[in-house]
Amino acid sequence: MDSMWTEPDILVLKLGGELIESSSDLKRVAGDLAKAAECQPTVVVHGGGHEIDAEMKRAGIRKQAVDGLRITDESTLEVAISVLAGRVNTRLVAAVNAAGRPAVGLTGADAEIGLAELAPPYRTNAGHVVKLGLVGDPVATAPHKLLSQLVHAGYTPIIASIGVTRDGQLVNVNADALAAQLAVNLHATTLMVVGTTAGVLDIDQRSLPRVNDEDIERLVANGVISAGMVAKLTSCRAARQGGVPNVRIIDGRTSIDVNGGTGTIIDTATVVPEKEKAKL
């Protein structure tokens, strides 16, 4: 049964694709990931938005986005699959292997680990309703046995943020949302979102060591945080509500320190997961 494959101290790490665009950064990040995985079972989810944008520009495809979320038509999806599942994922897997840690490249389509439903029309921060197209929302019922088996066998799964619906339609999935849902599904103890900012910043661009729900609502209302950070915080809050106790957004530009580093602890509302309720 699946419970035999769960691990109480799994780390799910979401890696911003902008951190691995150059060969030198890729080598450094791969080394950091290998070290982290030696200390704690680790599952990596990566994006690659900048490389998707560049490839779309080369192909003459216009980018459409709202509140940090990419609107995805057929041509945009084909580019995303090619860049994320092909170029970025393969390159990162090879680099982590070269750093001494056995890694396995996956997408959300593999064993349906990234099972998703087509996203409903989205209400923007400005109050408009837009259709996101071939964009998926990860679901809680996605099977996680493959990931648990790989982790227990000593491998580090590295997952491109491409999802799949029950009828086999590939979809673009926000990497933060996928990482958050995987953290919940795996009963991970930690979700770490690694990017190019020093966590959540205040109006003076200083890193906030900790934020709660009220802090986030105030920052959004005052227009202090960007649309991209709003999307990250939404995913982090979902992970907390799903029972992930430790959620952080950290700066990965110089190193990825899973035990510290510059960043923000997400201290939003949480619920007691079902496996813990049974103990009460």
Regions found by a protein language model. Give the residues of each.
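C-terminal catalytic "cap/lid" subdomain
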Residues: 2-280
